[in-house]
Amino acid sequence: DLIDCNGRQCLTIACSGIDARVAESVHELGDSPLLSGRGSYLAAVAVNFLFRGIGQHWRVTLDDEVIEDDFALVSMCNGRYYGGGSTPVPEARMDDGVLHTVLVKNISRMKFAGLFSAYSAGRYRSLPPEVIRVVTAKNVRIQSEDDIVTCLDGETIHSRDVRLTLSEKRLNFFGPKGCDPNYGAGPK
């Protein structure tokens, strides 16, 4: 499976919001001779978390359901891992024709920091349903009056209208006998 985002293809996770802004900042800060690797990531988290705020006001359409609210992030997951090992939806599989979309409402910095570990570890079911929701919508649209930063497998784009859907294109993997691309995936 692949995710189509405004005509661009993504294999694992397409995320919009705070996580995409952090990814973009990592690339920007990575050019600094004073920062590299983990240092640029930690600096990017600090800049975005402390100085830029977490959420943005978006109109999110999940198939036919429209939600207008302030969101910290919206991520469409085809794979399980991104951002240095975060696993928001452990049951996401790259070969099942299902895309899991995670919606995280805008919350205070303190609450976000307190919930991030569970989110990153794929324990979204243990988090408050008024804060996080996971759905299997076929079409997701995110609209805003301001630019939305979206990260597609590490590459960022800017748009005020982000359209995410299961791509008609497919990708074949080759690996050694017995290799399973879904090894470690949660139950279907």
Where does each model-flagged region fall?
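Catalytic core of DAGKc-family lipid kinases
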Residues: 1-72
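A residue-level signal for conserved active-site and pocket-lining positions in enzyme catalytic cores
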Residues: 3, 22, 74, 101, ...
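Short beta-strand-to-turn element immediately C-terminal to the catalytic PLP-Schiff-base lysine
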Residues: 5, 13, 25, 76, ...
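Glycine-rich phosphate/pyrophosphate-binding beta-alpha loops
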Residues: 15, 19, 75-89, 156
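Short acidic/glycine-rich loop or secondary-structure boundary segments that cap or lie
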Residues: 19-22, 68-70, 82-85, 109-113
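Gly/Ser/Thr-rich active-site loops/lids in small-molecule metabolic enzymes
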Residues: 28-40, 90-111
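Glycine-rich, charged/polar anion/phosphate-binding loops
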Residues: 43-47, 56-63, 84-89, 125-128, ...
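ATP/nucleoside-binding phosphotransfer catalytic cores, i.e., glycine-rich phosphate-binding loops
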Residues: 62-68, 93-94, 103-188
